[in-house]
Amino acid sequence: MAAVKKRKTAGRKGAGAKTTTAASAHADEVARRNAAQDDVVVAQIRDAATEVHRDILKKAKPDLAFPVRSLKNVTYSANRGYFEMGRAKKVRTLTVNTVKSFAQTLRMMGLSKELVETNDFATKRDAYYQSKNWEAAKFDEQTESDAVMDDIEAMFSTRGTSREQLRFIPDEHGGAVAGRLVVLDPDRDTGVVERIDCTRFGSGAYSIPSTVEHLSFETDAKFVLAIETGGIFQRLQSHKFWQTANCILVSLAGVPTRATRRFIRKLSDECNLPVYAFVDCDPYGISNIYRTLKVGSGNAAHLSQFFCVPQARYLGVTPQDIIDYQLPTHPLLDVDIKRGKDALKNDPFFQVHKPWRKAIEQLLSMGVRAEQQALAKWGLNYVIDEYLPAKLRNPQAFLP
């Protein structure tokens, strides 16, 4: 989905104001594309069900094939810049022993088709409770329905369809957003587009919704700054760092949710914006938070084409920053050391990038970790006045 052309937004309307004619026309185009995508999704579900029906008529055992979701079945594509699922499959064949799980899978696919056709959605929890009307096919625990939904998502991802397009949405919302961005959000019933100005939330911020496919953007920002901790995000927001740096701030709140990752990806793709990550300097911040944002994860590599942000670069905090800025540190815990060694030994992303191998090896040899807030040693606003401006003068030096 294309964004409204990147342009100056001086004099734009505040949150809640009605859209311009141009924005309304763009929203109509987005709606048309979404409707066309819905038709594709329904056709894909029908095709999968038709194959099962055809096998039954031939008196053959029908089966459904799903990608194996693990790091062992993942490769890193340097060309695309994200994890890709390998060829390993698990097959669910209809037998006496699998009849319940097979039926549950088909019922979940049927629920997805109904949601698409009625322009509705369901969370994982909703889907679990919906199954209570499925008689013998009902789920006893939500973990069972979650696993079936994840398998269906992985299966349809090979056809270019995401879980959100299947109309299953996360239970959690995304992170917070502040700065030089107007979000165009069409009402699902009336089509009237609301212009949400992310500079006008006072000391607060815009909250990313659970699904973001219908959104489009206007911005004149130069980059997106993705921030791990709420404390640093709040400091940058309250001092309007986005104004002086001409940027958009996004709070990751730890490992970013699907909605947050998709929002950043759409924003980067549609507005041609670089994304800089600012997280704690520890193996968790590097190999869980940043790596998941940039290339995805082993268990969810089937999502990477939709949710990762290949354009992301790592601003800091780096192991070298700990030395250069004489930051207060904490000793690495055993779990940190294990996570760092696992990244070097088993993670395809870090194995491909020599600068990252060097940085992780440096961190392990130092035996310490440092938080973003450690910069407050030099003053509460040192991160705003000195650290970030110095870093942003040389983005070419950021880790890949």
Which residues does each predicted region cover?
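Nucleic-acid enzyme cleavage-core boundary/entry regions
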Residues: A2-P274, P283-P400
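Active-site glycine-centered loops adjacent to acidic/histidine catalytic or metal-binding residues
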Residues: D280
